[in-house]
Swiss-Prot record:
The lineage of its organism: Bacteria, Pseudomonadati, Campylobacterota, Epsilonproteobacteria, Campylobacterales. Residues 369-453 form the KH-like domain. PANTHER family: GTPASE DER (PTHR43834:SF6). Gene3D superfamilies: 3.30.300.20, P-loop containing nucleotide triphosphate hydrolases. GTP 2 binds at residues 203-210, 250-254, 314-317. Associates with the 50S ribosomal subunit. The gene is der. Belongs to the TRAFAC class TrmE-Era-EngA-EngB-Septin-like GTPase superfamily. EngA (Der) GTPase family. It comes from Campylobacter curvus (strain 525.92). This is GTPase Der. Residues 2-164, 197-368 form the EngA-type G domain.
Amino acid sequence: MQKIILVGKPNVGKSSLFNRLARQRIAITSEISGTTRDTNKAKIEVEGKDCLLIDSGGLDESSELFKNVKFKTLAEAKNSDIIIYMVDGKMAPSDEDRAIFYELCKLNLPIALVINKIDSKKDEQRAWEFINFGVKEIFEISVSHNTGIDELSQWIAGQLEDDVIKTDESEDFDDFLENFNDEGELESSENFEDRYIRVGIVGRVNVGKSSLLNALVKDARAVVSDIAGTTIDPVNEIYEHEGRIFEFVDTAGIRKRGKIEGIERYALNRTEKILENSDIALLVLDSSEPLTELDERIAGVANKFNLGMIIVLNKWDKSEREFDELVKEIKDRFKFLSYAPIISVSALGKKRIHKLYPLILEVYKNFTQKIQTSKLNEVIEEATKAHPIPREKGKSVKIYYAAQFGFAPPKIALIMNRPKCLHFSYKRYLINKLRQNFELSGVPIVLAPKKRGESDENEEQ
């Protein structure tokens, strides 16, 4: 699949054009310069031709962080097929604009100069100042008013070759993703074994989420910096490891509520959306610092989506605490995540990272498993005999049988005579019995007491 990359200085409208071409809001857009710091990718169709659209980080020489972004952007451009260089039509062309453009021209790829924010006759006159760039393909557009986009799309389609697929590792995954059934229907364990594993990396700012992503995929595509809050857009990496395909998403770092500005508030909402579409969450904690109330809140956000969960103690090489001591504190403070395994790593030092993949696979297997109905009912029957369900106002409360009605996580219906009378403490008792008898480490269990004939709604954990 051929690749199109959007390149330009911060705040020229690359993310807005990306969203327009992708026909959905994927990249965060804002008037704040430098909103996009990492690359976003989306498979799109232009005039009936499939291609991969890449929204690069803004190119700017004014900070150390953006020098890192520039290096990554130019490397990404070198591996693309078409370059769209965007400039701000409300600003006169600068020497920096020309320097970046000529550097891209050296790659000998089809390149178009796209002048955005042409919203008036005055803007059209100013656009003539860009004619001395010496490029034939110049497009005047206004993404906000949706003008000029059709002409640009037609030019892109003309550059795309028919039936050309590059032998790029990432493209091997596209056919796989196309065949993936994500309609929310109940799937068999066999289908789960074939599909890719979606892993969201969450935590407060500067705990090392981007470093962990880089260590996991052995590639430094996510921007890493000591500046708190470096990642704003969620960063996706699709990666194959020992025959399994993983999609890692490095979500935006979550700050204290009072410090969340508009752009980061939207990023927080995006984080929740990412988790909603994930299978497993890696909750990253900074083991070199005391646990905070914000760590607990973030854990609660991740927990509400009923994902597989792994707690990652990062920066372990800088920690002065004993592992067992910190684990005890986590289990005391995060009681609702008592089922989550805990692992210590050093992302920057790449220590113990290799132990994460087997752990992710183990949790995913538990997350998607189908429990044999006969064994499930044996465990429930033994549990109720050992500790009968308390009576309600003198009337007996019975479980007739149990049946699994969903996966990811395991969802189990308890068919009863009085489902509303099953106390939450007894449900917790049953969940503990299930954990003792089945491999359910790292996953929540949803128990849904129901009457005969009742639909699988109002699930309770």
